[in-house]
Amino acid sequence: MTINLFFLTLTIKKRFKSLEEFEREQQIEQIYDEMKESQLKHLYLTNWR
């Protein structure tokens, strides 16, 4: 019974991210979006020259 509770607790902790993890993921996502947009602009401008 104790082992089951232990694993249940671990599972619940993994499901809920800490605020720092959430903020870090948001930053990474924002950087990714900015780079993607920059590349698309570059491709668009190079194709029309």
Curated annotation (Swiss-Prot):
What organism does the record attribute this protein to? Bacillus subtilis (strain 168)
So which domain of life are we looking at? Bacteria
Q: What lineage does UniProt assign to this protein's organism?
A: Bacteria, Bacillati, Bacillota, Bacilli, Bacillales
The protein here is known as Uncharacterized protein YrzI
InterPro entries per the UniProt record, alphabetical: YrzI
